[in-house]
Amino acid sequence: MAAKKMHVKKDDMVMVIAGKEKGKTGKIMRVLPGKGRVVVENLNVVKRHTRPNRVNTQGGIVEKEAPLDASNVALVCSACNKPTRTGVRVLEDGTKTRFCKKCNETLDK
C-alpha cells in the first residue's frame, strides 16, 4: 500500500475531532503514513500485557499510546488556538509552507 499524504507532521499540536478522545489536544509523537495513522502523546492509551524479556525483565501490564486515524485529528493553529484545516502557500523564495485557513497565519516557521 502506498503511503498517504499526511496533513500533520511530528511535533504538531492537534485536537481529536472524533472518537472516544474527542475534544482533547496533544502533540504528535509519530506519524505512520503507510497506515494513515498518528500517535498522539497521552491520548488513546491502551494496556498491553507483556511477557518478561531481556528489555523488560519484570513483564506485566504496560500502558502505551495507540495510533489514531489521521482523519480524526485536526491541526491546532498556534496563532488562533483553534483546530483548523490547512492550505499550502508557495513563498517568494520557492519554499512551500502550511497556513491556517481560519486566520491565514503561517504555521511552519
Curated annotation (Swiss-Prot):
InterPro entries: KOW, Rib_uL2_dom2, Ribosomal_uL24, Ribosomal_uL24_CS, Ribosomal_uL24_KOW, Translation_prot_SH3-like_sf. The keyword Ribosomal protein applies. CDD domains: KOW_RPL26. One of its GO terms (cellular component) is ribosome. Keywords: Ribonucleoprotein, Ribosomal protein, RNA-binding, rRNA-binding. One of its GO terms (molecular function) is rRNA binding. Pfam families: KOW, ribosomal_L24. GO terms for biological process: translation. SUPFAM superfamilies: Translation proteins SH3-like domain (SSF50104). Part of the 50S ribosomal subunit. Belongs to the universal ribosomal protein uL24 family. One of two assembly initiator proteins, it binds directly to the 5'-end of the 23S rRNA, where it nucleates assembly of the 50S subunit. This is Large ribosomal subunit protein uL24. It comes from Syntrophotalea carbinolica (strain DSM 2380 / NBRC 103641 / GraBd1) (Pelobacter carbinolicus). The lineage of its organism: Bacteria, Pseudomonadati, Thermodesulfobacteriota, Desulfuromonadia, Desulfuromonadales. The gene is rplX.
